[in-house]
Amino acid sequence: MALQQEIIQALGVKPQIDAHEEIRRSVDFLKSYLKTYPFLKTLVLGISGGQDSTLAGKLSQLAISELRDETGDQSYQFIAVRLPFGVQFDEKDCQDALAFIQPDKVLTVNIKEAVLASEKALREAGIELSDFVRGNEKARERMKAQYSIAGMTKGVVVGTDHAAEAVTGFFTKYGDGGTDINPLFRLNKRQGKLLLKTLGCPEHLYLKVPTADLEDDRPSLPDEVALGVTYDNIDDYLEGKQIDEKISQIIDGWYVKTEHKRRPPITIFDDFWKQ
């Protein structure tokens, strides 16, 4: 089997989807997990103002609202968490996303002081962080805050990982990649847009240029610049379409290089890294 087909199979991507069916599938998935573990009462998710967290947030709120209606248990809650590093340049998009999602509760945790304190402690130990590694520090601090909130609210941390992100490993290991449950897994980027459009999301939230915005030296660096391919390229690849050989090789390369990110910690029984 060609690598492209192996990847499509591993990530569960369909060449075509019914948006209503996929919305229902994700909502039921979240509900089923919470119903299986009745001691869990909240879904917790960081909201950045981008496409992925907006979609995951809306699906989470729909799931929680339905659970309350179906069970009569009013303790179920969706907690949206704003996690700016100082002042976020696209704060209006974040507020627009929250207005669309209508979360039960919004918490704001400014991670700047925590990141700077960590950087200072490392510097005193003789470790000077590069701008790139400092960016990963931000992502991990955001996830740490979400797990603290989840720990105090009987919660589950919801992730935003989707197929176009997974295939390239475009996430921080144990940062935004370190979550409990991923309702967007199997969808590529354009399919996520379709779900948001179907849900009535303001289009500027899913048409904006995707950026992780973690690096201070390269603020708002577009994902597509960092990856060297466009999301349309990646989506075509994941839908099984024939694409330019050079583009295909770049995507193949990202997948192979980042395999460790998609696996739990490597043990003596693993051998994928030897191949």
UniProtKB/Swiss-Prot annotation:
Catalyzed reactions: deamido-NAD(+) + NH4(+) + ATP = AMP + diphosphate + NAD(+) + H(+)
EC number of this enzyme: 6.3.1.5
Protein residues bound to Mg(2+): 52, 165
Keywords: ATP-binding, Ligase, Magnesium, Metal-binding, NAD, Nucleotide-binding
Keyword Manganese: no
Keyword Nucleotide-binding among record annotations: yes
Gene Ontology process terms (BP): NAD biosynthetic process
InterPro entries: NAD/GMP_synthase, NAD_synthase, NH(3)-dep_NAD(+)_synth, Rossmann-like_a/b/a_fold
Pathway info: Cofactor biosynthesis; NAD(+) biosynthesis; NAD(+) from deamido-NAD(+) (ammonia route): step 1/1
One Pfam family this sequence matches: NAD_synthase
Coiled-coil ranges from the UniProt annotation: none
Any single Gene Ontology cellular-component annotation: cytoplasm
Domain of life according to the entry: Bacteria
Binding-site residues, ATP: 46-53, 160, 189, 211
Assembly and oligomerization: Homodimer.
Biological role: Catalyzes the ATP-dependent amidation of deamido-NAD to form NAD. Uses ammonia as a nitrogen source.
Annotated family: Belongs to the NAD synthetase family.
PANTHER family recorded: NH 3 /GLUTAMINE-DEPENDENT NAD + SYNTHETASE (PTHR23090), NH(3)-DEPENDENT NAD(+) SYNTHETASE (PTHR23090:SF7)
Protein known as: NH(3)-dependent NAD(+) synthetase
Lineage: Bacteria, Pseudomonadati, Pseudomonadota, Gammaproteobacteria, Enterobacterales
Gene: nadE
